[in-house]
């Protein structure tokens, strides 16, 4: 029960929160044509954590930041995800391109093209947008996120709306069209015609257009011209403490019920689990 009191003040509030979207059960796997990478479909846990709010004046300027402590809001839905190959992380690290910004940009590029394959409105499918306060911080974060592109149905409850199911079915075309859109756009850092989204709750602050092409090409098993990539850190993606770790396989509830398309049994072998320490960094050092 919440109690509301009417007051006259010169400010409004804006919620401060972040959302973790994590697959918890694989229901179907689809091999991406011409690639060793796979797309997965299944149950997604969406956990929203509200940690405070801003007070904004009439010109929407921040005049105060207030911290609150609330329990997380957790719900479940259906969605699709793609685990990013280690080779992409190696290249991004070598060129000092921000990994979280690259993931965020690639997710936006794919999201923008979903209406090409299923009738939907902007916002019907969502992703985990990256928060600049965390991604560009100069101190270690306890909230490490997997190197994964994740998309989930915003409507339909635990059963989903079916839109992400269609995206899963057409994932090969989605990836190719997203890459073509990124490469055809003449902007330098990203815009709404390629990797930015007008619906991004974090105002597209964490973006790497160059990094998104590395991720998309690696998923499609396409050749990547490393020397043609810019050397970071990029102007709008300053280097911070790494917040991304290798994605771990999400097991099915029952292998007998798992739908597999061009995937061998060993795809869920324990050997596929990995840690970030397996990746060699550009400087030959550690995390």
Pin down the residues of each PLM region:
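Extended, highly charged accessory segments
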Residues: 1-287
